[in-house]
Amino acid sequence: MPVYNVEKYITECMDSIVSQETRWSFLVTVVNDGSPDRSRELLRKYEGLPNVQIIDQENRGHAGARNTALRHIRGEYVMFVDSDDSLRPGAVEALMNTAKEYNCDIVQGGSRMFIGERTLGQTAYPDAEHNSSLLGLPWGKVYRAELFGQVCFPEGYWFEDSVLFLIVFELAERIRTTSAVAYNYRRNVGGVTFSAKGNPKSLDSLYITRRLMQDRRLLGLGETQQLYDKFLYQLFMNMKRILSIPSRNVWVSVFEESQKLREEYFKDFRTAKEEYRPLEETLLGGDFRAFFRAITALWTSVP
């Protein structure tokens, strides 16, 4: 769990974790990422607990904090928790029961989105086997720890969680969802989702896509039809984020780079998904205006 400037939430988050009632033993690895507020002071009351370890480091961002924690894995499975969120009662028990019963590489639980005392929505899943098309959010899941044996979160980028969507989920052979609602997600107006709007750093969404496609090659991972469809979704997400930058020149450059990526990695692939065909056709035809229209149409139909 990365900790940075969360003095308002850290106690609620930690209490929700250490109070989990479960037959499964677990270790809470907290990485104080150079937090300048009172977060570290508030963590002191947990230092004596046998299943809590606190690591202090200079600030390296969310990715750097998670990578530090991953180097200290001792268990068979790992879970990521953001320190302004919290676990639901019974989360560890429900996720781990499913993981062990079905020998899963990843188990995804449901989540509740909230702000203050108000619930904004809830995402629920069936008890079922799943494929690797889960959205690339790190929380609300347990992962087999060995999935991160050769993989880490890219540091220095926004949207570093894309590594899950484009690499980690692809490494998993068995994924299941559970109907248990495991996670409370706080809608944070200070997070990247909101602060990225209009910020040139939004371009990281494109940069990290190229970086991760290169990393896939280094890991010996080939291209597949399923990955191609995910890639098209990723291009949509990239443009959705970057459109907040008020520069047509930037948009056109991103379109051209997207064409190059598709040509480099997926030249001979074609999608069978109706919702992605207009986007694909614009990349093949080099029509930026049609690309813009395709992105706008997807915006209303794809989460």
Predicted regions and their residues:
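Nucleotide-sugar donor-binding/catalytic module of glycosyltransferases
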Residues: M1-R211, L218
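Structural motif
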Residues: L218-K230, P278-G286
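Catalytic core of nucleotide-sugar-dependent glycosyltransferases
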Residues: A182-N188, S195-T224, L235-R241, I245-F269
